[in-house]
Amino acid sequence: MMGAEKAEGMEELELEEGGGSPSPSPMTAAGKMQALDFEHIGSLAAVAESLSTGSKWRRALTSVRVVILQAKINVLLPFGPLAVMLHYLSANHQGWVFLFSLIGITPLAERLGYATEQLALYTGPTIGGLLNATFGNATEMIISLYALKNGMIRVVQQSLLGSILSNMLLVLGCAFFAGGLVHPSRDQVFNKASAVVNSGLLLMAVLGLMFPAVLHFTHSEVQYGKSEVSLSRFSSCIMLVAYASYLFFQLKSQRSLYSPIGEQEEEVTEDEEEEKEITQGEAICWLFVLTIWISILSGYLVDAIQGASESLNMPVAFISVILLPIVGNAAEHASAIMFAMKDKLDITLGVAIGSSTQISMFVIPFCVVIGWIMGQQMDLNFQLFETATLFITVLVVAFMLQEGTSNYFKGLMLILCYLIVAASFFVHVDPDSSNNK
């Protein structure tokens, strides 16, 4: 037995010396470890990819919840598809198509303002100002472009005019009234210097609208029907340059002029550091989606204006000046009242008067230039009745703002002025209404 064990030991020794040992070599072990590492890394990559995909889906669902489900006003969203269905099911219900489209656009306009604010949180003040100038009145601009494409020039003029009147009288009046009721023991204060600058721009806009109207109705044109269009196009280019200069003045050159006064500065700084509820890419995607959906509904809305006027027994001027701007200004209306109740009148003025300035100095001239490109005779001749209404409104609001204070009585006066304007357009017969049929 001992001899056999020795023989086996000698054989194992010979195998090891001859290189035929079945034990693993160092190279083979390293290869196995490398393969194991690659498998481990591959499994980690797969897990990471799976987690990333799941995270993207969760992020998308969160974005939908924040933008669509979180706002209570979005209960009105189904009215949009109902308007589209009703348009194709029956041609005899244009009044309902108009009303449903009007209601359906309201939450979209509010959410468009929200997406713009979220995107502005990721940009600097200059780009943020340009975003507000572009998307702040995007609803009015889209409706106007659709009407302009269909040759409904008076609808374009009246809807933009109505948006200015609504912001200056109804939105600002409700904000002053609500703020005064919440703070009844004292007058609320705001930055008078910025209000004076905006009032000057609004008076410049009135100047640009007044001369084509006066030129037309005094029959003092060099070429009847052509000179006012040429003057309007030239004035529109000048107004666009003036608005661009205003943006530079506000955002770069004289930023201190627009800083809040008193104790509002610290509060506004805290509010400006609000949470970024959606990412920059999501904000851009939502801007695109909401703009497309507003564009679709705007087409049905514009097509139904004439039929709605006949079925509802309302003048087209009243629909264009009063009803359409209320939808476009839904976001401004809510935010202006909210900031006034929080005693932040500078933000309220930036929303209400700033929006009026954007429309008068940017949107209206922009529509004239676009109409020029389209071959439409869009001009700044808003007729004497509309131009006089705008002129008186600007004067009233300028007097209200000259002291730099507000209270509930000033707000009440502005609201009552708007009711008078609304009643005036309800009984007003547009001399050019036949052009829009």
Swiss-Prot record:
Tissue: Expressed in roots and shoots.
Organism of this sequence: Oryza sativa subsp. japonica (Rice)
UniProt topological domain (Extracellular) ranges: 87-88, 148-161, 216-228, 303-310, 374-379, 430-437
GO cellular component, one term: plant-type vacuole membrane
Primary site of residence: membrane
Transmembrane stretches, start-end: 66-86, 89-109, 127-147, 162-182, 195-215, 229-249, 282-302, 311-331, 353-373, 380-400, 409-429
Protein name as catalogued: Vacuolar cation/proton exchanger 2
Region (Cation selection): 136-171, 328-363
Any single GO BP term: intracellular calcium ion homeostasis
UniProt-annotated stretches for the region Disordered: 1-29
Pfam family of the protein (one): Na_Ca_ex
GO function terms (MF aspect): calcium:proton antiporter activity
Membrane topology field: Multi-pass membrane protein
Record-stated family: Belongs to the Ca(2+):cation antiporter (CaCA) (TC 2.A.19) family. Cation/proton exchanger (CAX) subfamily.
Cell compartments where the protein resides: Vacuole membrane
Record keywords: Antiport, Calcium, Calcium transport, Ion transport, Membrane, Transmembrane, Transmembrane helix, Transport, Vacuole
Its biological purpose: Vacuolar cation/proton exchanger (CAX). Translocates Ca(2+) and other metal ions into vacuoles using the proton gradient formed by H(+)-ATPase and H(+)-pyrophosphatase.
Topology feature Cytoplasmic, residues: 1-65, 110-126, 183-194, 250-281, 332-352, 401-408
